[in-house]
UniProtKB/Swiss-Prot annotation:
Protein name per the record: Acyl-[acyl-carrier-protein]--UDP-N-acetylglucosamine O-acyltransferase
Subcellular location(s) of the protein: Cytoplasm
EC number, as in UniProt: 2.3.1.129
Lineage: Bacteria, Pseudomonadati, Pseudomonadota, Gammaproteobacteria, Pasteurellales
Disulfide linkage: none
InterPro entries: Acetyltransf_C, Acetyltransf_C_sf, Hexapep, Hexapep_transf_CS, Lipid_A_LpxA, Trimer_LpxA-like_sf
Self-association and partners: Homotrimer.
Encoding gene (name): lpxA
């Protein structure tokens, strides 16, 4: 049985399998295909030719454009058909031909997307990725499995991120970057392989960071990249700075979970 709210607008040319749950004021355009284990919450709009499969949950007020594919079987050869998920939050814009694959048991079972993100044309988000809030992946940006993007990350067009990489909050990756190691918060990076070239000051200004906070961030950047010391050697000083500067605390979580080493 399909559970479709009476206020939903669904094209007669769309295919919605029995079991799908469609919320209030959802709009589904022609030639969309919605699988039986899909849940779509209020005011989300699917333009034409969108395919949503698997155990996929989509929040409110998202816009999903034509030829996007969400919740499809992942490309991990270990996958054996387990009921893994894609979970997407609210107010995301998922543009044409974006692909978002379901998770794997080995990776926790969920590919998770937060709120207020923009995925531009032909972006790919592989199994078990965890994308936070306010991120942008530009055209043809690709994330391998298990990648983590923290808040306000921008991935430039034609960039590729290696599996298990962590990209810290407020990072700006220039177009065409190949990223195989973790990128600390607030960094601008570009290249093949990506290298750091300063703090993302313009992005921080746009998001309301004050001068003392940006000064602290620049100081930590210099500790990491210009002191000649290892992360283990500078971490105590970063911890001390974080006691009085909340914006520095994100470094502590980043280094706690970083396993691939950082870009240099």
């Amino acid at each position: 049985m399909r559970l479709i709210d009476s206020t939903a607008k669904i094209s007669p040319l769309a295919v919605i399998e029995d079991g799908a749950q469609i919320g209030a004021h959802v709009e589904i355009g022609p030639f969309c295909v919605i699988g039986k284990n899909v849940k779509i919450d209020a005011k989300t709009i699917l333009h034409s030719h969108v395919v949503i499969n698997g155990h996929t949950e989509i929040g409110e007020q998202n816009q999903i454009f034509q030829f996007a594919s969400i919740g499809e079987i992942n490309q991990d050869l270990k996958y054996q058909g387990e009921p893994t998920k894609v979970v997407i939050g609210d107010r995301n814009s998922i543009r044409e031909s974006v692909t978002i694959h379901r998770g794997t048991v080995q990776g926790g079972g969920v590919t998770r997307i937060g709120n207020d993100n923009l995925f531009m044309i032909n972006a790919h988000i592989a199994h078990d990725c965890n994308i936070s809030n306010h991120c942008i992946i530009a055209n043809n940006g690709t994330l391998a499995g298990h990648v983590r993007l923290d808040d306000f990350v921008i991935v430039g067009g034609m960039s590729a991120i290696h599996q298990f990489v962590i990209i810290g909050s407020h990072v700006m990756l220039g177009g065409g970057s190949m990223v195989s190691q973790d990128v600390p918060p607030y960094v601008m990076a570009q290249g093949n392989h990506a290298q750091p070239f300063g703090v993302n000051l313009e992005g921080l200004k746009r998001r309301g960071f004050d001068k003392p906070t940006m000064h602290a961030i620049r100081h930590v950047y210099k500790l990491i990249y210009r002191s000649g010391k290892t992360i283990e050697e500078v971490l105590p000083e970063i911890e001390h700075i974080a006691l009085n500067e909340p914006a520095i605390k994100v470094y502590l979580d980043f280094f706690k979970h970083s396993t691939r080493g950082i870009i240099r």
